[in-house]
Swiss-Prot record:
Residues 1127-1574 form the Ketosynthase family 3 (KS3) domain. It comes from Cordyceps militaris (strain CM01) (Caterpillar fungus). GO terms for biological process: amino acid activation for nonribosomal peptide biosynthetic process; fatty acid biosynthetic process; secondary metabolite biosynthetic process. Hybrid PKS-NRPS synthetase that mediates the biosynthesis of the toxin tenuazonic acid (TeA), an inhibitor of protein biosynthesis on ribosomes by suppressing the release of new protein. TAS1 alone is sufficient for TeA synthesis via the condensation of isoleucine (Ile) with acetoacetyl-CoA by the N-terminal NRPS module and subsequent cyclization conducted by the C-terminal KS domain. TAS1 has the following domain architecture: C-A-T-KS. The N-terminal NRPS module contains the condensation (C), adenylation (A), and thiolation (T) domains and catalyzes the formation of the amide linkage between the isoleucine (Ile) with acetoacetyl-CoA. The PKS portion of TAS1 has only a ketosynthase (KS) domain and this domain is indispensable for TAS1 activity by conducting the final cyclization step for tenuazonic acid release. In the N-terminal section; belongs to the NRP synthetase family. Signal peptide: none annotated. This is Hybrid PKS-NRPS synthetase TAS1. Keywords: Ligase, Multifunctional enzyme, Phosphopantetheine, Phosphoprotein, Transferase, Virulence. Residues 33-387 are annotated as: Condensation (C) domain. GO terms for cellular component: cytoplasm.
Length: 1582
């Protein structure tokens, strides 16, 4: 049969200019009922968008042919209104209410209430009536429209009527509309008969009471647990297609319903029978599968669909009301794909059906209660579903049609039952999310999957959609079968698998850094590594040649690693933090051919027999574009892939040689071990010099995931580690037990679904805690066996927790053997011996150390092939279940501590070699730290530590060196290390209690202050020294200039030190980065004194009780504050203005989007009054505004004379200020006044001297001193509107209004006012309709303002007035304000005389300084968070070029320093990290620039606010309007095709997290800059 048409006729509408003010109920009332929980969520939406219609649903009843009169139809409607309370209800909230839960419904008396019925006769009025919003406080929630159509039949005029019931979802649901359809049809059929009415339905108030009782019952608690489980570890759909550009035509936001299919009743019955469940559950499974396929891969998280449940007890069947409950149902597509690549659709239906069955039992639990419960648990996905599904009940007959609500979802699948039992599938999509092509692809996949599901239930999920084919976790693109060991070994180069990934998913992100917003795609990474590989080959790199890499830029490091492999060579990473002696030793052993670095020192190669050729990281730019990568001739699986260096007992570092077959075997084996695939986000935790990094980069990129980096990898412990997991949405990472134990228990880490832990012994408690939260992998593997060779998987559902000694089973093709010491005999289960590992992961041995290789490595036969075996030196046994248990080390003294492998004998040798005064030494592990015991007792521990720190890695330097008289010896006369540990290894016990330095808030005199400051630093040094001793566990106090790491510290202890400092000095808010970047006691004391502030000093008799006084904090904080301190954010909550060509903010936006010109062309009559000089011309073009005559004196309690004297700038601003405050929902002219500051950037008053009639004032005194008596705009506005906060007029030329914003924000930050009204106004008199100019002047002789254009010849003057209302963001959110944008950073400054050839010429360096300061204030680690800058851009060639260069300089300078600012004392206040050169700097994300002066001209003092309002609307609406017109770029700007900064020629779609900058420049050198973000962006950051 043909598919019935299903048009859709409702949609959102633009808000009217006036704001909705809810009214109290009027008239006779029969009941007051509180809102139910299911209504509350819709009420909150309504209060935010009262005029939107996305929650209107409409019932259509076609009465054509019924011969009913209009009067009869209206009477039947009124009968329904009398019968059902909800049809006579209005909705309200008391003005004193503190929460929306205090809202209520007012049921109006039936006898005096009449339904609102509109009678329309044309389609246009019908559409208008159906597309309007409702004032629910004055209108009943269901509006009736009767459409009359007339036709001539047999010479008679016949009327046909169609009835529409348009109801807000807060009052009616689909069941209610179905019931109304039946009652209305029944009334029509009954006609005038006196059929007794049915019994009255139960009251909705009874439902509200029952719901309240239910929510306090044990059943509700069980339901809450079920629903929380449905949303646990889920993620919203993030669609793979690009969002369509916004349409410019009006009405583009109207959604429509497309009918995709019609299913006859017999087809539905067969569908149900095939799966032995309801067809609806099968259909929901189809939708869940297809939408998952069209969303970006999320292998560790399922998604949910919002499914509508009736939630209506049988007794309430006839109650017209809203009871429907739309709840999230988990779609376990990712879970099934993660478990098995052969998962079937039938399995999906079974799981979805089970979820829906349980949901039906718990459908009474309201969605809002779930959101509240989830918020208590820190879960934010409850309301994140982007797809909804509903089944609308059958209507009375085929004359009735139901049009569902739009909702707020990206996709809404509506199954509508027809009278014949068939069901139509209609789909409503958000046109801003799904364009026609994306929707057509989705439709095709839905219908294809439906057809497939009707043929067979057991089809594999991956065969339904091509986009799901590679969604299984851990699949190699074109890789070998993991079971085919020969194919795995022959694969040779892992970089080939990564290249295959680049071919299949070139545009997906390979590398990412959430802190600075940078990323690199697979395609870009592949191309970059190709260029580098070509260069390496041209320099002679080939098979088994060693290439040393020492780089700071992590993206570059990955690219160079791949490049080395593509060139056929072997890489070794040199840690730049190593001491020089260690680097020299490594380079001597490596015998490298090439040394790739971003910094060189000839001293590195002092011990090299043949120094390597040095290669700059920028050298690959010289590679010709047509150069091609040559295949590696004779490549073999046994070629070297990389070297890893570990400590050696002889003092010479051991270089472990890893072959390509070892690497490919390990990466292939991880398919069965590590849950990583497309869409996985993996943290690069380990430094590249350590083999654990191979688990991260090689595995992640081979399997198509995203490798995520951080700015401060050395600080990846505790809260910073948790912050980075959240910021980067990490799904998996590998770490050590010591680091894992530092993550606070309260951190939820919702994105983290799997964790690998290893490198040292774990505790049972740690494994137990984390295995309850996620998939925990207990890993084991010496470096000699390629990263990890055995794992134990502990799932959250595990009944028992394995012993910490249990590290599970071997990787595929790896054999775990237990042998006696120094023998190859294989011991049986349960027998303890040395753990030996055999198989293709066992490496070649130690470079240049054949004797050691022969001692540790053997050759044996395993699985019918000859393979290597490695003797690990670890002691353990294999249990009866085949799992390996590790019990510690054999008799050697090689250990692992905090994941670092070290040889205690090597550390002792370094002490003896570098410190001739030491006779004997023994290094031990005491309380999880290295301690050296040395004799004689006269030794100086600090001196020994300083010397060996030049030879050993920092992690191998003992935290404490204890001098003793002698060390115990064994019978052979050697140091008895076991006896040393027994005699001297007892814990030194806890440090003595640390007393804080108390800082008072008493302000001393200047002389006293200077003395006290010095005393403060000294006393803080003493306090911090004691803290160091406590944290480091050392007896001797470290020197004030010894770094924390050289004193024996490491990242875990640094985190502990930071916690101690925060506990001791909470008001200072010292951050972890503060501690890290100030690594000595002296620097930390200086930094802490700065954070305490200049007004604090230490009294001579310090109090020891920390609770007695608080640490002082300065009231005038400077830019040298800690970035970790909570920087306040500010919201723009109100806006208004008059602009050239636009009388409102909305009209301004429309003009900008349409790229129209708001500048007016006059008749030129003003030339007569222009007083033109020789060479001048009058240009009849001006940016004029409307409304200058709208000011009415009586509205402002002024006489006509007072108004006529008053500067029109101030008249206009009074009106606009009031509009802005009203837009912000702030009451104006209140009796008690409002704590609002007023800050106005205003142009000079030209009205006084040029247009004010002299006869206006009768007072000679006032005429004589009119300039003195002229009121300031800010104070006058504060007086007229009764605003009590600070007031200020700002005169900074074209920067005035943006400088006023800066001053307002400072007042808000200081607490001087609760909100701020900021204005900008410029009106020039006399009003001539044009201006005088001449060639070479700043005003255009052609009357065209063309910013950034080669044809620009100047600006066009304009008038304008604008105002914004600012609040602290926290206050705005608390008050429920609409937030247009958030001001995240701001700064002002002046050029001075820097780089200026004259007063009027701008300075690029001055502008760059202010832009960088604003970025720092916004805490942007790099510029790339800013996507667009709204320039001052006045259309003067030199001015535009200098401003453009200033932006370029700001970007370059900020990138070079990472935003770091240095305090006067030398302590560092970090705002980022120093960035090393990287590929991303060669092709960074483009920063676009533009200017609105091409649309409006230069409104001078108001122009800054023009730009701020434009930018606010851009971040709010997600799109930036382009320049009005742009031909060739201004040549002075030097814009090239690859320039980082580019003019905006077309609309720019902003992504979540993009920031927008705003610049204003004032005559003579005043610079102001703000950085704006959307509310969603800052909420995500928080």
């Amino acid at each position: 049969m043909s598919i019935p048409a299903m048009p859709f006729i409702t949609g959102p509408v633009a808000e009217p200019q006036e704001q909705l003010r809810l009214s109290p109920p009027r008239g006779r009332l029969s009941a007051i009922i509180p809102l139910s929980k299911v209504q509350e969520v819709l009420w909150v939406d309504y209060l935010r968008q009262p005029w939107a219609t996305h929650y209107n649903l409409t019932l259509k009843v076609d009465l054509t042919g019924s011969n009913l009169s209009l009067e009869s139809i209206m009477n039947n409607i009124h009968k329904l209104g009398s019968r059902h309370d909800m049809l006579r209800t209005t909705f309200h909230i008391d003005s004193s209410a503190q929460h929306t839960s205090q809202s209520y419904m007012a049921v109006h008396d039936a006898a005096s209430s009449f339904q609102n019925i509109a009678i329309v006769s044309d389609d246009a009025r019908l559409q208008q009536a159906l597309r309007r919003g409702l004032d629910l406080s004055t209108e009943f929630p269901v509006q009736w429209i009767v459409h009359q159509a007339y036709s001539v039949v047999d010479g008679r005029l016949v009327a046909a009527h169609t009835v529409y019931a348009m109801g807000h979802h807060i009052a009616v649901d689909g069941t209610s509309m179905s019931h109304l359809s039946r009652e209305l049809v029944q009334l029509i059929q009954d006609g005038d008969t006196t059929t007794p009415p049915p019994p009255p339905p139960p009251s909705y108030g009874e439902f509200v009471q029952r719901q309240a009782a239910y929510l306090r019952s044990p059943e509700a608690q069980d339901a809450e647990a079920f629903w929380l489980a449905q949303i646990a570890h889920t993620t919203p759909h993030r669609w793979t297609h690009a969002a369509p550009l916004p349409a410019s035509a009006p009405g583009h936001d109207y959604r429509k319903m497309d009918t995709w299919a019609f299913f006859p009743s017999d087809e539905l019955a067969a569908w149900s029978q095939l799966y032995r469940t309801s067809w609806f559950r099968v259909a929901v499974s189809v939708i869940g599968l297809v939408t998952a396929g069209h969303a970006r891969p999320a292998p560790h998280h399922d998604s949910t669909l919002q499914v509508a449940f009736g939630a209506r007890a049988p007794s309430f069947a006839g109650c017209v009301s809203h009871m429907a409950n739309t709840m999230p149902i988990r779609q376990p597509v990712s879970s099934l794909l993660r478990r098995s690549g052969s998962a079937t659709f039938a399995e999906l239906v079974q799981l979805v059906g089970k979820n829906i069955s349980q949901a039906k039992k718990n459908e009474m639990y309201p969605f809002l209660s779930l959101v509240e419960a989830a918020a208590r648990d820190g879960e934010d996905t409850a309301a994140a579903s982007r797809v909804a599904v509903t089944l609308s009940p059958r209507l009375a007959d085929d004359r009735c049609t139901l049009y569902p609500v739009n909702g707020v979802w990206d996709l809404f699948f509506c199954f509508l039952e027809h009278a014949d039992g068939g069901v139509a599938l209609g789909v409503i999509s958000d046109p801003a999310v799904f364009g026609p092509a994306a929707l057509a692809a989705l439709r095709a996949d839905v219908l294809r999957t439906v057809a497939l599901s009707q043929q067979t239930p057991d089809f594999p999920l991956t065969s339904a959609l091509s986009c799901l084919a590679d969604r299984q976790v851990a699949t190699l693109a074109g890789g070998p079968d993991v079971e085919d060991v020969d194919a795995v070994i022959a694969a040779r180069v892992v970089s080939d698998w990564i290249r295959s990934r680049a071919a299949t998913q070139p545009d997906e992100i390979a590398l990412s850094n959430g802190e600075d917003g940078t990323s690199l795609t697979y395609g870009a990474l592949d191309a970059s590594s190709d260029r580098k590989a070509v260069h390496l080959q041209r320099l002679g790199a080939g098979r088994n040649d060693v290439v040393v890499l020492q780089l700071g830029a992590v993206f570059d490091m990955v690219a160079w690693i791949l490049a080395v492999h593509k060139a056929g060579a072997c890489f070794v990473v040199l840690d730049r933090q190593l001491p020089l002696a260690r680097k020299q030793a490594i380079l001597r052993v490596a015998d490298a051919k090439l040394f790739v670095s971003d910094a060189f020192d000839d001293a590195y190669f002092a011990d090299c027999a043949t120094p390597p050729t040095t290669v700059s990281v920028w050298a690959d730019t010289a590679v010709p574009a047509d150069a091609h990568l040559a295949p590696v001739s004779g490549a073999a699986p046994t070629d070297l892939a990389y070297l890893v260096f570990t400590s050696g007992s002889t003092g010479l570092p051991k270089a472990i040689e890893v072959e390509h077959q070892n690497l490919s075997s390990y990466v292939s084996a991880t398919r069965a071990v590590v849950p990583v695939g497309r869409g996985s986000r993996v943290l690069q935790f380990a430094p590249f010099a350590f083999d654990a990094s191979v688990l991260e980069w090689a595995v992640t990129l081979s399997y198509g995931g995203t490798l995520c980096f951080v700015q401060h990898p050395a600080l990846l412990v505790g809260d910073y580690l948790a912050d980075m997991v959240d910021l980067n949405q990490i799904n998996f990472f590998h770490t050590t037990p010591s680091v894992l134990a530092t993550i606070p228990d309260g951190r939820r880490l919702p994105s983290l679904r799997a964790l690998s832990v290893g490198g040292e012994a774990s505790s049972a408690g740690l494994l137990d805690k984390w295995s309850r939260r996620l998939h925990l992998i207990h890993a084991y593997g010496p470096t000699e066996t390629t990263v990890i060779c055995a794992t134990e998987h502990i799932l959250p559902a595990s009944d028992t927790l394995p012993s910490p000694s249990n590290i599970g089973r071997a990787n595929p093709h790896v054999a775990l053997l237990i042998c006696p010491e120094d023998a190859e005999t294989v011991l049986g289960p349960g027998v303890t011996g040395e753990i030996c590992i055999a198989g293709p992961q066992v490496t070649r041995g130690y470079r240049g150390q054949p004797a050691l290789t022969a001692a540790q490595f053997r050759t044996m036969e395993h699985n019918g092939r000859v393979t290597r075996m490695y003797r690990s030196g670890d002691r353990g046994f294999i249990g009866d279940d085949g799992k390996l248990h590790i019990l510690g080390r054999m008799n050697n003294r090689e250990i692992k501590l905090r994941g670092f492998r070290m040889d205690l004998a090597a550390i002792e040798k370094s002490i003896l070699d570098n410190c001739p005064e030491v006779m004997t030494a023994s290094v031990q592990v005491v309380d999880d730290k290295l301690v050296a015991f040395a004799c004689p007792a006269t030794l100086q521990g600090d001196a020994i530590r300083q010397r060996i720190a030049l030879d050993l890695p920092s992690y191998s330097v003992p935290a404490d060196i204890t001098a003793v008289d002698s060390l115990p010896l064994n019978t052979n006369g050697k140091v008895d290390h076991k006896e040393v540990l027994q005699q001297f290894g007892a814990s030194t016990g806890p440090a003595a209690a640390i007393k804080p330095v108390i800082v008072t808030k008493t302000a001393p005199k200047k002389k006293e202050l200077q003395t006290s400051d010095s005393n403060l630093v000294d006393r803080l040094e003493a306090s911090i020294t004691t803290l160091w001793q406590k944290v480091l566990g050392c007896r001797d106090a470290p020197g004030p200039d010894v770094t924390f790491y050289n004193a024996g510290g490491h990242s875990i202890l640094l985190s502990a030190l930071h916690k101690e400092l925060v506990t001791l000095y909470p008001a200072a808010k010292i951050s972890l980065l503060d501690v890290f970047y100030n690594p000595t006691i002296r620097r930390q004391a200086q930094r802490l004194s700065e954070l305490v502030g200049d007004d604090g000093f230490i009294p001579s008799s310090s109090v020891s009780d920390v609770s007695a006084q608080d640490v002082a904090t300065p009231g005038n904080s400077t830019t040298a504050t800690s970035v970790a301190a909570d920087a306040p954010l500010f919201a723009i909550v109100g806006m208004a203005g008059r602009f050239p060509g636009a009388d409102s903010v909305e009209a301004m936006w429309e003009l900008l989007m349409a790229q129209r010109d708001g500048i007016t062309t006059s008749d030129g009559a003003g030339a007569e009054s222009a007083d033109l000089a020789e060479g001048e011309v009058f240009v009849p073009r001006y940016g004029s505004i409307n409304g200058l005559e709208d000011f009415r004196a009586s509205d402002w309690n002024m006489s006509d004379e007072d108004a006529q004297v008053l500067d029109p700038q101030k008249r206009m601003f009074l009106m606009i200020a009031e509009e802005a405050l009203q837009d912000a929902s702030i009451p104006v002219r209140t009796v008690s006044g409002s704590n609002i500051g007023t800050f106005v950037g205003i142009a000079p008053n030209t009205y006084l001297s040029s247009a004010l009639p002299s006869s206006v004032s009768s007072s000679a005194f006032e005429r004589r001193y009119k300039a003195v008596l002229d009121p300031t705009a800010s104070t006058l506005t504060a007086y007229k509107l009764n605003l009590l906060g600070p007031s200020m007029d700002v005169s900074a030329a074209c920067a005035s209004s943006l400088v006023a914003v800066h001053q307002a924000l400072r007042a808000l930050r200081a607490g001087d006012c609760a909100a701020a009204l900021v204005g900008g106004v410029s009106l020039a008199y006399p009003q001539l309709g044009g201006y005088a100019t001449s060639d070479g002047k700043i005003f255009s002789a052609r009357g065209q303002c063309r910013p950034l254009d080669a044809a620009a010849d100047g600006s066009v003057p304009a008038d304008g007035v604008a105002a914004v209302v600012l609040k602290p963001l926290v206050a705005a959110q608390t008050d429920g304000d609409r937030v247009y944008a958030v001001i995240q950073g701001h700064a002002i400054g002046t050029d001075g005389a820097v780089d200026k050839i004259g007063f009027t010429v701008p300075s690029s360096s001055g502008q760059a300084k202010v832009i960088s300061a604003a970025m720092a204030d916004a805490r942007l680690a790099r510029h790339q968070g800013v996507r667009y800058v709204e320039m001052h851009g006045s259309g003067t060639s030199i001015g535009d070029a200098l401003e453009y260069k200033g932006i370029e300089r700001a970007v370059a300078a900020y990138e070079a320093t990472g935003g770091e600012s240095r305090c006067s004392s030398g302590a560092i206040s970090p705002t980022g990290t120093e960035q090393q050169p990287s590929d991303t700097k060669q092709t960074p994300r483009t920063l676009f620039v533009g200017s609105n002066k091409g649309n409006f001209g230069n409104a001078e003092a108001a122009s800054g606010l023009f730009s701020l309002i434009k930018a606010s609307l851009a971040v709010s609406r997600g799109v930036v309007p382009p320049l009005r017109q742009l031909g060739d770029c201004n040549e002075l700007m030097g814009v090239a095709e690859g320039s980082t900064v580019q003019p905006l020629r077309k609309q720019l779609r902003l992504e979540k997290g993009d920031r927008v900058g705003v610049t204003a420049l004032g005559y003579g050198g005043v610079n102001a800059h703000c950085i704006l973000a959307s509310l969603e962006a800052v909420e995500e950051r928080e």
